[in-house]
Amino acid sequence: MAAAVGRDTLPEHWSYGVCRDGRVFFINDQLRCTTWLHPRTGEPVNSGHMIRSDLPRGWEEGFTEEGASFFIDHNQQTTTFRHPVTGQFSSENSEYVLREEPHPHMSKPERNQRPSSMVSETSTAGTTSTLEAKPGPKIVKSSSKVHSFGKRDQAIRRNLNVPVVVRGWLHKQDSSGMRLWKRRWFVLADYCLFYYKDSREEAVLGSIPLPSYVISPVAPEDRISRKYSFKAVHTGMRALIYSTTTAGSQMEHSGMRTYYFSADTLEDMNAWVRAMNQAAQVLSRSSLRRDVDKVERQAMPQANHTDACQECGHVGPGHSRDCPRRGYEDSYGFNRREQEEERFRAQRDPLEGRRDRSKARSPYLPAEEDALFVDLPGGPRGQQAQPQRAEKNGVPPYGLGEQNGTNGYQRTAPPRANPEKHSQRKTGLAQAEHWTKAQKGDGRSLPLDQTLPRQGPSQPLSFPENYQSLPKSTRHLSGSSSPPPRNLPSDYKYAQDRASHLKMSSEERRAHRDGTVWQLYEWQQRQQFRHGSPTAPIGAGSPEFTEQGRSRSLLEVPRSISVPPSPSDIPPPGPPRPFPPRRPHTPAERVTVKPPEQRRSVDISLGGSPRKARGHAAKNSSHVDRRSMPSMGYMTHTVSAPSLHGKSADDTYLQLKKDLEYLDLKMTGRDLLKDRSLKPMKIAESDIDVKLSIFCEQDRILQDLEDKIRALKENKDQLESVLEVLHRQTEQYRDQPQHLEKITCQQRLLQEDLVHIRAELCRESTEMENAWNEYLKLEKDVEQLKQTLQEQHRRAFFFQEKSQIQKDLWRIEDVMAGLSANKENYRVLVGSVKNPERKTVPLFPHPSVPSLSPTESKPALQPSPPTSPVRTPLEVRLFPQLQTYVPYRPHPPQLRKVMSPLQSPTKAKPQAEDEAPPRPPLPELYSPEDQPPAVPPLPREATIIRHTSVRGLKRQSDERKRDREQGQCVNGDLKVELRSYVSEPELASLSGDVPQPSLSLVGSESRYQTLPGRGLSGSTSRLQQSSTIAPYVTLRRGLNAENSSATFSRPKSALERLYSGDHQRGKMSAEEQLERMKRHQKALVRERKRTLSQGEKTGLLSARYLSQPLPGDLGSVC
């Protein structure tokens, strides 16, 4: 499968045919014989076997059904297991038992052993002839084996010497099972589509020979819902041309299934469809020709060689082997022409009626259809253009064989009167119809058996049935009339154009290498130069040929030099026009030039407005590639497929192509402006839409602010981390002035940036807070609106009104649900600005009796004289014992969140539900003669301590006992003495001194620490000024008596005693203190024993207590 096939490369009286499985064979019409070898190159073309570089000319390597390798000599039509050069067996056959015949010639008795449509198997009798001595073990494959065609070891071996047209990723649907889509790496080369597991292209997973396939987008009946999907449908040559009869419907072999592919983008899909159609149409629009002595049979319907044989796919060197039911004379269908003529006459009337009834528009241009039908001497339009038989006119038409033998003719234009257009036309129309159904759902599209819809005269139509020859290059006389304008893909065989391509500079090639078309173009040129230009025309270099090419270039509308038209490239058809009958003496491939008024469609782009032509094309095509319609002045040449024909582009065409692309841009803008609707548009239907839109806009504003704040915070954190490193370096290099100066300079710059970022962050935070307030307001409005709508919905009486209100409610719900995801993020961000988590706890000394500032203190309150502190101040808050208590909540030992000094005390709102009430004031003095009060038992919450495990409780008890004996702190806490008493000095100062320090401590001006662990912390509350006497809890630091040496001129208040270093203990003896402490410790031990006995019920008790009020006596809490 190496040599390229071209009609002009074949000698006279030679043509080629294609089997159903894509294999190509060549027909000598003069000798009535077939061969797998190209008559000029001597190499097989797509025969299903491998061509190796170490094999002589005409030799190929094949494989048996068992996998053994053998060699095929197409010259002698023999097979052998020995290498023709070395004479040795292949190393791959070491596991096989080979039996070589003395003269293994392809014999007729073994012709039925090979199944049809198996490209990967032998097309000759290689396997069967080598095993003739022992035919018993020979396994005859059934038709079910056909379904494994092209996979794994059955795949065609890829020739790495052939350039790759396209490669890339595609999704392919499995042929069986669950029909999953799998991603595969596809490579299009040598008219075959290979696919691999990945881009390394190591092992071929399968191969698909594209000739005789039709590639098109998926249709609705395919039931493929995947985007950008297309398919490769195998249809035999006769099925493309003649699909109405039973024989035609049987042409599609069961082994040739439909392949479904899916690309990632629309551009990729279009590129793959074009490239695969190029490879598929190389061999699918071919037909076989007859020579001069059978010219009278030219107008008769004849099918392909493969159709006359029921085995079809194997007309070749082993032709007689594959067709046992026929003799040599009827192997090509000549003896059946009389029967076919009768069948053709019987088919004329129904086909004619069907043509008259079809009113659907053809996807081809009228000029293109002219080229399709007028050029076919034996095809349907050939009969239509020539209603009477040539014999009736007295002069038989010229046969193709006669024209091929006429040396006076030179090719000056692509042949338009070739029977091979039947197949290509049917392929293109079927492709266009599938595309039209899928894209537009056009109900006027005809089924596949009516894929030639066109309004025309009621002339007889015929479909060739049994023999389709591929004519060689035909030539027009210099004085012959030119065919009408057309865009039909045909051959491109002009020495002038190829020479002008050689003049292209590398810059020009690079400048226009912008798509798949130009990639195919460059690939064709590389292959052409690499393989020695196998597609050179016969009349190349002839002066007459050059003149004819130039003269035709002035009369024809150019077509793209790249690819045949795809469904998206097909312009709309023009009005119907009758075809004039051919003149009696007009050769088969001469066509009549039509009057100027009948030539239109593609002429519009030249004589008329380009915008008008663009508008026509846009009606029936979603995308029209202007590269497929170059301007006037360039010959109408198309490339039938890659690697077969060279093509070129001169400087004039390149310049005109640029102009057309420029005009396309201008026309696109005008068309868009023209097509714009002038009807006004309403965005909002009701006030609900407006409110929801504003609400969503506010959410977007918050999102933007959140992103800005997030970015600023990241920058701030980075700068702070760098500055922290610089601070450490400053301390480290303190004794190095030079280095320290550099660090200081860098530090100063970063500090300026930090200040700027912090200012920006503060501004954005303020804006975020304002936006959040607006957001909450809008949310409240929307909620009220929702409630109103719900109320209206309940009251609504009419169904239409209820339906409209329900729609509005759904809109509100959808918007609220969509915005709820970001709401919590905004709340946390704004809350972190208002109430930061960590508040500063100062470590510097604080006045023992802090006071309010003059602006914040009440006029009646007087500041107390401060005293020097000796330790960190403790938070002390006043709270009447008779007031309502908040349930106690245990907290681990931690610093209390205090308010910043910058905040006003008026902003400090009490939060009774979050904090415990403040402690009442401490007493000043009491009489030692007084009976000490009885210590009440600990409340239930005393069981909730830091350590909840049994081991931790026991260890805590031991530590407290040891600390008590040593006079140390209990668990790191100072000893706390609790006493309930009536303090006259304190009561006297309720209206004066006492509330002031309490307020100053409670307010935001003071910085303080909490009592660690078990202290009851509460929200700010003012001591209610009352003349009643109420008991209070005394909180005293347990200090030794010997430390109390300082004396006071007046009694100290509770706060002064707390923050002063010396307390007077003269009123209580040491024995009384020890006795009191013992009672207290005994109560603690009893409670802990009770906790140890309860075990894991502690959590339940604490949960139960949280729902109960605090006991009346707080004196047991330490």
Curated annotation (Swiss-Prot):
Disulfide bond positions: none
Chain positions with Phosphothreonine modification: 867
Chain segments annotated as coiled-coil in the UniProt record: 697-798, 1064-1091
Any one Gene Ontology BP term: pore complex assembly
Ranges of residues in domain WW: 8-41, 53-86
Gene Ontology CC, one term: cell-cell junction
Family annotation (Pfam families): PH
Listed Pro residues bias regions: 564-579, 930-939
Distribution of this protein across tissues and organs: Expressed in kidney and lung (at protein level).
Interaction with CTNND1 as annotated region, ranges: 535-693
Principal localisation: other
Residues in PH domain copies: 163-281
Record key words, sorted: Cell junction, Coiled coil, Cytoplasm, Cytoskeleton, Phosphoprotein, Repeat
Region Disordered, residue ranges: 100-145, 334-512, 528-629, 839-873, 886-968, 1003-1024
PTM sites of type Phosphoserine: 533, 542, 566, 601, 605, 609, 857, 864, 868, 900, 904, 983
PROSITE patterns per record: PH_DOMAIN (PS50003), WW_DOMAIN_1 (PS01159), WW_DOMAIN_2 (PS50020)
Basic and acidic residues bias spans: 100-113, 334-355, 434-443, 494-512, 586-602, 955-966
Signal peptide start-end: none
Compartments it resides in: Cell junction, Adherens junction; Cytoplasm, Cytoskeleton, Microtubule organizing center, Centrosome
Polar residues: compositionally biased ranges: 114-131, 452-481
Taxonomy, superkingdom: Eukaryota
Molecular-function GO term, any one: delta-catenin binding
Function (record text): Required for zonula adherens biogenesis and maintenance. Acts via its interaction with CAMSAP3, which anchors microtubules at their minus-ends to zonula adherens, leading to the recruitment of KIFC3 kinesin to the junctional site. Mediates docking of ADAM10 to zonula adherens through a PDZD11-dependent interaction with the ADAM10-binding protein TSPAN33.
PANTHER family: PHOSPHOINOSITOL 3-PHOSPHATE-BINDING PROTEIN (PTHR12752), PLECKSTRIN HOMOLOGY DOMAIN-CONTAINING FAMILY A MEMBER 7 (PTHR12752:SF4)
Subunit structure comment from the entry: Interacts with CAMSAP3 and CTNND1. Interacts (via WW domains) with TSPAN33 (via cytoplasmic domain) and with PDZD11; the interaction with TSPAN33 is dependent on PDZD11 being bound to PLEKHA7 and facilitates the docking of ADAM10 to zonula adherens through interaction of TSPAN33 with ADAM10.
Entry protein name: Pleckstrin homology domain-containing family A member 7
Species this protein is from: Mus musculus
Lineage, broadest ranks: Eukaryota, Metazoa, Chordata, Craniata, Vertebrata
